[in-house]
Structure formats: C-alpha cells, structure tokens
Amino acid sequence: MCSSDLRESGKARYIGVSNFSPEQIDEAAKYCPIVSVQPPYSLLKREIEKDVLPYCIEHDMGVLSYGSIGAGALTGKFKERPTFEDGDKRGEFYEFFNEQNWPKTKAMIDTLEEIASSHGKPTVHAAINWVLKQKGITVALVGARTPEQVIMNAQAAEWELTDEENAKIEAAYAKIFA
C-alpha cells in the first residue's frame, strides 16, 4: 500500500517525508500531497537552509526538524569532548563530536550557555529555542533518555530568545564556523 492509498483509505490524514531534497519532494508530490518534511537541523547542522527550508517556506510545508539538540551536544552536558560507550555511535556518526570539530562545537555551546544562564535556564533551552525561532520551522523534535529530560526539553517552551539573543547566536556562529 502506498502513501496515497493510506490517505485515500482514511488510515493516514496527511503525508510527510523525511530527509528528502526538494527534487525528491517534487517527485513524491506527483503521487500525493506532501504537507511536511522532517530534516535534521540544529546550530551544528544547518544544511537545509540552502534548499530544503526555502522550498518548504515557498510551498507552505511544515518542517519538523530532528536533531535539534545535536545528538545531545547542545544540551550543555559535555564540558569537554565526550567519549561514548560501546554501541553509542554518536562519536562516529556526528562530525561535531570529532576531535577536529569539538573546539567549534564547544564554543557554540558556551554561547548558548551564556544566554540560557542569563534567564536562569539550562543550555538545552537556548538550543531548542534557536531552532524554533528560525523562519519556516514548525516543530523542533528532540530526543530524551529519561523522563526528566522530557520535562526539561518541554520547559523550553516557557520562554523565547529575544531578537538580540538570536543575533548574538548568529554572530557567534558566523565567527566560530567561518
């Protein structure tokens, strides 16, 4: 059963795609309306700003970004480059954890930590709020390993970054990743 059949039979109301390029979205849209896209997006992974995000804005599609806290890197948990347990592939899969990129990652974390702490909030809130402040983003999907992390992540919705704070993050990003 294909996605359009699921929609027509009432088993699915809407169809979204994950990790699609604009060209792939166009191809999928030939078969059924696509209402949302789920790409990776965070301060450490911004590739969608070049094509996917503008496409979604132009076509009025929802964007449910995943990886919004950079596989945990942007939580503020890691004060130095982490070493992961056997079976945890973050160190291999995410380039921002590697030895060469860690100093840049840490500098970005420090910027988020400074802003979040000025509100008396955890660093992860600034990372989530930055994603939510970006034009075209509908939802910032975040992972959690404990019930406490779920609550902490949800509490990010209790405040927002100011335009000045967002500009400070963007300036830091431009300097760090230039």
What do these predicted regions represent?
Residues 4-177:
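Beta/alpha (TIM)-barrel catalytic core signal, keyed to glycine-rich beta->alpha loops juxtaposed to Asp/Glu
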